[in-house]
UniProtKB/Swiss-Prot annotation:
Protein name: Protein CutA
CC terms in the record's Gene Ontology section: membrane; mitochondrion
Natural source organism: Rattus norvegicus (Rat)
Signal peptide: 1-32
Keywords annotated in UniProt: Signal
Gene Ontology BP terms: protein localization; response to metal ion
């Protein structure tokens, strides 16, 4: 009897693949990697919706509630002006300026290469739209780069501090004047 197939029918299509790997010892390394897939991918494969984020054990931090946003600027003067403004407006808790990066990109059909300053901005994820709107309004580029990645883990006191510093803005839903 094909136990992998029988159990797969009972448990669902995603389980069939996993059980097939488990029934073949040579494929155990592959099966063990499958077990390391993020919960969201596994839930998508099974057809059930992913669970909502919950606070990390004991820290009170909800994964993804803080983001690191990245903005490139043509020079340090512009980067400092934008950095000071977003911190003053509490759209960000902290901005790091990383000088002398080289960006290579296509613009209007031509390959360009420029020296730029990269800003790494730490903020609440809920503030990314307001941060983006503000940066676009003051940035000298025709198309400003503003991208953000959620922070899944980190030093709990630091992540709490990011929330504290930006709380007055996130509570009102708009930036301070």
């Amino acid at each position: 009897m094909n136990w992998g197939g029988a159990l797969g029918v009972l448990l669902g299509g995603g389980a069939t693949l996993l059980l097939s790997f488990l029934c073949m010892p040579a494929l155990l390394p592959v099966a063990s990697r499958l077990l390391l897939l993020p919960r969201a991918l596994l839930s998508m494969a099974s057809g059930s919706p992913p669970s909502q984020p919950s606070p990390a054990s004991g820290s009170g931090y909800v994964p993804g509630s803080v983001s690191a946003a990245f903005v490139t600027c043509p020079n340090e003067k512009v980067a400092k002006e934008i950095a000071r403004a977003v911190v003053e407006k509490r759209l960000a808790a902290c901005v790091n300026l990383i000088p002398q990066i080289t960006s290579i990109y296509e613009w209007k059909g031509k390959i360009e290469e420029d020296s730029e300053v990269l800003m790494m901005i730490k903020t609440q994820s809920s503030l990314v739209p307001a941060l983006t709107e503000f940066v676009r309004s003051v940035h000298p580029y025709e198309v400003a780069e503003v991208i953000a990645l959620p922070v899944e883990q980190g030093n709990p006191p630091y992540l709490h501090w990011v929330h504290q510093v930006t709380e007055s803005v996130s509570g009102s839903g708009k930036a301070l004047p």
